UniProtKB/Swiss-Prot annotation:
It comes from the Bacteria. GO terms for biological process: nucleotide-excision repair; SOS response. Residues 439-605 form the Helicase C-terminal domain. Residues 35-192 form the Helicase ATP-binding domain. SMART domains: DEXDc (SM00487), HELICc (SM00490). It holds the Pfam family UVR. It is found in: Cytoplasm. GO terms for molecular function: ATP binding; ATP hydrolysis activity; DNA binding; excinuclease ABC activity; helicase activity. This is UvrABC system protein B. Belongs to the UvrB family. PANTHER family: UVRABC SYSTEM PROTEIN B (PTHR24029:SF0). It comes from Bordetella petrii (strain ATCC BAA-461 / DSM 12804 / CCUG 43448). Forms a heterotetramer with UvrA during the search for lesions. Interacts with UvrC in an incision complex. The beta-hairpin motif is involved in DNA binding.
């Protein structure tokens, strides 16, 4: 086996880190899909089984073709997993993350039956907002960019032309007045704050301007002026103030995707007034006087805000006026920032394509009510996600990636490439059917065998009630078990899966949450209860996906508890057996001995997963922190800043954790002093 190292390809800006050379079906899949791209094929499908290294195949195709890429995943958890893997394969290139930046989002809505208007309410995750801004910056600046995203990318963001026009380019030696720089920064939605220097703010001290770029995770820019000339540009650490490097040139990107030049705002105000006049005439003619008064009051307030500040709350509802688009035209989205020759990969496409098709209809139904009852102008209907046909019109050359392609991929694909043989030699799990009458007792016996071998178990049920009852039953019998359900937020889900891998507990019970892409090599048994209840949770695709969760383990085994074999079960078992036969034949022909996957448990996204818990907070204090008084004082200041930052972002659990760590450190210092 070749040693791990970086691989470069001709005319490609990517430096691919290869921990191992492609193996199994990977070389043929990489060559087949890359050749299809070169031949101009629009749609291709990678039919890759669980654990066959589909992400590695995607990375190899991107590196060989040397074109920017967008990789879409069906949810934030899988996007985070893909992002972490892509960063490992391309550590020297721009790998970016573009998902919804809302931790919590309540869209504005009106319920006519109760005359209830619900105001828009949301909580934005600052870390993800910074990553979104970084993603568009990379697309505009460099070719070696891989964006990992979710369906969030079909929702409207600012027009690429306006966004690019607002960029501020600073060069050492250029002539520009301090007043002009400040005016440009305010127009780019940066705020002046001399006390609290955070992302998207700037501060002024005499002839020195400090700017904290909105897309920068850790470095800020210091601009020193001499009269009206830029004397120097320096990147520095905002916490310590230490200068990291001098730069001859720096580009400051807008503080938001929704920035708009002043003349565009003034033009939009006139067209909004025009639309308001027409709409008020119509509502009055129909005798809807309450709706007319409501619409006029709300819109006039927004117009005043736009006139004075250049933006208003809910500015996205006027996006059609701001972009100058015609009624019914699709909004600008992340797809518009992609170069024409970009590549697209749609991971778990059997789920993601359905999502892309469904987003528009739900959004439209809610907004039509708001327009009908005078809460919004009709142009608000054009602030929407793309329809499926609009997304298709904007698609670049695309590879659908799935172990179970749906009808859409089968109809559209010009080329289907199978990736069934795994590089590790692992084969699909053995599938066994057992009677459902005694499923719970039988499962308990199987769990005890797996726990004794230090292996993990996934159990999938049909209903929430059954999942809860089963969790209680297993816990009463001494099994370390957790229950994963839809009420658990993204971050906690990632933590639960990590704890399962680390052995904090042994059995995870869920309903529809243990399927696509979950990468848990420690799981050796997947138990599917009531497998004969035909429906979307027990369809052929669902069963194949769930069985696949045990395919990363050497002793992988799947048990279907059923009293009859349904058509879906039969097809799923036949497909698993077909793949298993092909894998065993390949191993025998090449003399391969299957080996288990030893994958390090890592954090998916820096700063998103909470730190590891300790039995006592005192035990969590690193010895070097207590080395001397300076170190202790530095750590206390760090924790205090962390606590206030979290509290400001309404991240109260993290703020409480920082407070507890701070109290524990102070307690430890007091005890040591007393001793």
């Amino acid at each position: 086996m070749t040693a791990p190292g970086f691989v470069d390809f001709p005319d490609s800006p990517f430096h691919l880190y290869q921990p191992y050379p492609p193996a199994g079906d990977q070389p043929a899949a990489i060559e087949g899909l890359a050749q299809g791209m070169r031949d101009g094929l629009m749609y291709q499908t990678l039919l890759g089984v669980t654990g066959s290294g589909k992400t590695y195949t995607m990375a190899n195709i991107i590196a060989r073709l040397g074109r920017p890429a967008l990789v879409l995943a069906p949810n934030k958890t899988l996007a985070a997993q893909l992002y972490a893997e892509m960063r490992e394969f391309f550590p020297k290139n721009a790998v970016e993350y573009f998902v919804s930046y809302y931790d919590y989002y309540q869209p504005e809505a009106y319920v006519p039956t109760r005359d209830l208007f619900i105001e828009k309410d949301s909580s934005i995750n600052e870390h993800i907002e910074q990553m979104r801004l970084s993603a568009t910056k990379s697309l505009l600046e460099r070719r070696d960019t891989v964006i990992v995203g979710t369906v969030s990318c079909i929702y409207g963001i600012g027009n690429p032309g306006d966004y690019h026009a607002m960029v501020l380019i600073l060069r050492a030696g250029d002539r520009i007045s301090r007043r002009e720089v400040l005016a440009r920064l305010v127009a780019m939605q940066y705020t002046r704050n001399d006390a609290d220097f955070a992302r998207g703010t700037f501060r002024v001290r005499g002839e020195t301007l400090d700017i904290f770029p909105a897309e920068s995770p850790e470095l800020a820019l210091r601009l020193t002026l001499f009269d009206d000339e830029i004397e120097s540009l320096e990147l520095f650490d905002p916490l310590t103030g230490r200068v990291r490097q001098k730069v001859p040139r720096f580009t400051v990107y807008p503080g938001s995707h929704y920035v708009t030049p002043r003349d565009t705002v003034l033009r939009a105000i006139e067209t909004i007034k025009e639309e308001l006049r027409d709409r008020l005439k119509l509502l009055t003619a129909e005798g809807k006087l309450v709706e007319a008064q409501r619409l006029e009051q709300r819109t006039r307030f927004d117009l005043e805000m736009l006139q004075e500040l250049g933006f208003c709350k809910g500015i996205e509802n006027y996006s059609r006026h701001l972009s100058g688009a015609a009624p019914g035209e699709p909004p600008p989205t992340l797809i518009d920032y992609l170069p024409a020759d970009a590549l697209m990969f749609i991971d778990e496409s059997h789920v993601t394509m359905g999502q892309l098709g469904g987003m528009y209809r739900g959004d439209r139904a809610r907004k039509e009510t708001l327009v009908q009852y005078g809460f919004r102008l009709p142009s608000a209907l054009d602030n929407r996600p793309l329809r499926l046909e609009e997304f298709e019109a904007r698609m670049r050359q695309c590879v659908f990636v799935s172990a179970t392609p749906a009808a859409y991929e089968q109809e559209h694909s010009d080329n289907v490439v199978e990736q069934v043989v795994r590089p590790t030699g692992l084969v699909d799990p053995q599938v066994e059917v057992r009677p459902a009458r005694t499923q719970v007792d039988d499962l308990l016996g199987e769990i005890k065998l797996r726990v004794a071998a230090q292996e993990r178990v996934l159990v999938t049920t049909l209903t929430k009630r059954m999942a809860e009852d089963l969790t209680d039953f297993l816990a009463e019998h001494g099994v370390r078990v957790r229950y994963l359900h839809s009420d658990i937020d993204t971050v906690e889900r990632v933590e639960i899966i990590r704890d399962l891998r680390l052995g904090t507990f042994d059995v995870l019970v869920g309903i529809n949450l243990l399927r696509e892409g979950l990468d848990i090599p420690e799981v050796s048994l997947v138990a599917i209860l009531d497998a004969d209840k035909e429906g979307f949770l027990r369809s052929e695709r669902s069963l194949i996906q769930t069985i696949g969760r045990a395919a990363r383990n050497l002793n992988g085994h799947a048990i279907l508890y059923a009293d009859a074999i349904t058509a879906s079960m039969r097809r799923a078992m036949d497909e698993t057996e077909r793949r298993r036969t092909k894998q065993l034949a390949f191993n025998a022909e090449h003399g391969i001995t299957a080996r288990g996957v030893n994958k390090a448990v890592r954090e998916l996204i820096d700063g998103i997963v909470a730190p590891a818990r300790h039995d006592t907070l005192e035990s969590a204090i690193a010895p070097e922190v207590l080395a001397d008084e300076k170190s202790v004082a530095r750590e206390i200041r760090r924790l205090e800043k962390l606590m206030t930052d979290h509290a400001r972002n309404l991240e109260f659990e993290q703020a409480a954790a920082a407070r507890d760590a701070l109290n524990a450190l102070k307690q430890r210092v007091l005890l040591d002093g007393a001793a």
